[in-house]
Regions:
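N-terminal subdomain of nucleotide-sugar transferases
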Residues: 1-45, 51-56, 393, 404, ...
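Short alpha-helical donor nucleotide-sugar binding micro-motif in glycosyltransferases
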Residues: 82, 295, 303-308
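Conserved donor-binding/catalytic core segment of Leloir-type glycosyltransferases
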Residues: 211-230, 236-241, 251-254
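Nucleotide-activated donor-binding/catalytic signature segment of Leloir-type glycosyltransferases, i.e.
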Residues: 265-295, 299
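Aromatic "clamp/platform" in nucleotide-sugar-dependent glycosyltransferases that forms part
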Residues: 316
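Short hydrophobic beta-strand element within catalytic cores of glycosyltransferases
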Residues: 333-336
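Conserved acidic donor-binding segment of nucleotide-sugar-dependent glycosyltransferases
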Residues: 348-349, 353-360, 369-375
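A charged, aromatic-enriched C-terminal amphipathic alpha-helix characteristic of glycosyltransferases
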Residues: 375-410
Length: 410
């Protein structure tokens, strides 16, 4: 939900998705006569329509149903929204949730383009990478029994992937940004028209520059650790090798402390994955090296990038990580697993180090190498390449061209 809408409804603004708000603002600024509407979903039962700062907002109700399951009743709401706003073009951001599919099924003749963020149908293959079946069974918790364990988490990705593929076979135009998403989209729907356009990131990350002199030496920063796909366990597996050489190493992890047991509520809500992580940390006596920062807004996220010695993206799969893009834009030394579209974001050694996801020893070596060399790290080329990739004006001009080309095509 966009910040102006959240504030108007008295709802806490979401930390994620800030890049989308930046993109919407840029779209309005570059097209002063544009009529823009933004639609989203929420758990309640009433359709909300609001106009704020020249933008019309529609909030479609899920009536208490999960956003991961297909809700046929959304089709009628989409028809209401379409009739009220009468859009020339509809841009669906992301394929991960089925409310976009509901729009396309309700209005099959509408002019639509879909942006690829991640591809859940592909990510499902790698959901539990690095974790054995035995480890999953050994760490099932009460919360898993009620809400679903790691196996069911993967199953949910698979089910959502069915909706995703359905959506991609129904549309004629898609926007992507990596060789990875291009290959997979074309495999799903060969005739689809693929339009390349890079992402514009959040404003704060264009305004600062990392420096070795002001960073906290021998620290790592991870922006996510909540579920297996993000690769936190791989960092923990690499950590014993790292602290043998750099015993003062610290890992800052953005987000809630998934292993906290301070309250009964923490214990009750602990997932099997969190239990596995906690056991691993205890077994290898790693707790002193790990600091969960709590949820971070844009400014505080930026501060942690700047204070850290290295940014690591250890995911088992990514399309193009916005976190990696933010780190590169700031000039933080970067390491990423060689998965998905990571190679497109790290085309040269100046932009970072790539390693194979499974090779935790290689990850450890990459970290130790950067610890040693970061005093003389020259981030000029990385920042230049990243600034070109995430150039807000250039990306907005490209998006405008895509919109115009699609409208002419229909």
């Amino acid at each position: 939900m966009m910040p102006p809408l959240s504030e108007s409804l008295g709802i806490k603004t979401s930390i994620g998705g800030g890049w989308m708000y930046s993109s919407a603002k840029k779209l309005k600024e570059s097209n002063t006569s544009l009529e823009l509407a933004i639609a989203t979903i929420y758990p309640e039962s009433q359709l909300i329509v609001k106009e704020i700062e020249g933008v019309k907002y529609y909030v479609l109700p899920l009536n208490g149903k999960k956003n991961t399951k297909y809700n046929k009743h959304l089709e009628n709401y989409w028809k209401i929204v379409h009739e009220d706003f009468k859009p020339d073009l509809v841009h669906i951001h992301g394929t991960e949730y089925p409310h976009g599919l509901a729009y396309v099924k309700a209005l099959p003749n509408s002019k639509v383009v879909v942006s690829i963020q991640g591809l859940v149908s592909i990510c499902a293959r790698y959901y539990n990478n690095g974790i054995t079946f035995k480890e999953i069974l050994q760490n099932i918790t009460l919360y898993d029994v009620i809400k679903g364990n790691l196996l069911q988490g993967k199953k949910s990705f698979v089910k959502r992937g069915v909706y995703e593929r359905d959506l991609l076979t129904r549309v004629e135009h898609v926007i992507g940004r990596t060789s990875w998403d291009y290959a997979h989209v074309k495999a799903i729907n060969p005739p689809i028209n693929y339009h390349f356009c890079n992402e514009t990131l959040r404003k704060e990350f264009y305004q600062h520059q990392w420096s070795y002199d002001t960073c906290e030496k021998h620290t790592l920063f991870l922006t996510q650790a909540g579920y297996p796909l993000k690769g936190f366990l791989q960092i923990l597996k690499a950590l014993p090798f790292i602290i043998n050489r750099y015993p003062d190493t610290k890992i800052y992890v953005a987000g809630a402390n998934i292993i906290s047991d301070k309250t009964w509520k923490d214990k009750l809500k602990r997932t099997g994955y969190a239990k596995l992580i906690k056991r691993f940390i205890k077994k290898y006596k790693l707790s002193q090296y790990i600091i969960f920062t709590g949820p971070l807004d844009e400014k505080n996220m930026c501060l942690y990038y700047l204070k850290s010695n290295i940014f690591v993206c250890p995911s088992s799969i990514e399309n193009s990580s916005n976190s990696l893009g933010e780190a590169q834009l700031l000039g933080v030394p970067c390491i990423a697993s060689f998965v998905g579209g990571a190679a497109d974001m790290i085309p040269t050694e100046a932009c970072g180090i790539l390693y194979r996801f499974e090779e935790v020893e290689m990850l450890a070596e990459a970290i130790c190498t950067l610890f040693e060399k970061s005093q003389n790290f020259d981030n000029t080329e990385m920042r230049k390449i990243s600034a070109l990739r995430h150039d807000a004006d250039k990306n907005q001009a490209r998006l405008n061209d895509i919109y115009n080309n699609i409208l002419q095509d229909f």
